[in-house]
Amino acid sequence: MNKPANFSNIHKYYDLINTITTLGFDKSWRSQAARNLNPGSVLDLVSGTGASYKDLNNFDVTALDPDEQMLSLNKFDRKIVGRGEDLPFNENSFDNVLCCFVWRNISETEKAMNEIYRVLKPGGKFILLDMTRPKNSTLRILHKIGTFILLHFIGLITMNFKEYRFLYKSLDFYPQPEIHLNKNEYLSLDITRFGLFGFVYLAVFTK
């Protein structure tokens, strides 16, 4: 999987782009994801600028992201530079792991899933919120056309074409979540789709 060197060039616009590509529903969907969390500690995986900050006020949060410039805008008190494929934490460290709108940008999701399982406490939850393509083939084509135009246009006007082209292509990196995410044998799973055409999914894993 070919990733851009980093998202440092677009860190100031990253949250705005999430809002645009989710038709303005990203904040309400983040809140919906947070409502599925257990009480206690949360690892905000690939936290970026900390867009889930307002939804996690009542939790003990550790924000982790590979990009220091993203973390420089992050409001969480505890911030760590790191990758999901190699989490710098002991086993059974967290009551929850939360990952919003970035799972498709993780290079080795199988490794990341194993690491998440390792750091979750027994009974802990992994809450995954992300975008995908619609199931219906006709709607999938329409979604591809719409996101192609939108993300390439944003890339051109911000002069960061490579990063936004990557975000467009990342929607096709993995199979449908109902197939891709069911490969893990250690965590029970429940998936809900919402948004126009069902292009956003919420997956709730329990250890």
Where do the model's predicted regions map?
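Class I SAM-dependent methyltransferase SAM/SAH-binding core
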Residues: L43-D86
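A short acidic, Gly/Pro-enriched loop at the edge of an enzyme's catalytic core
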Residues: E85-V97
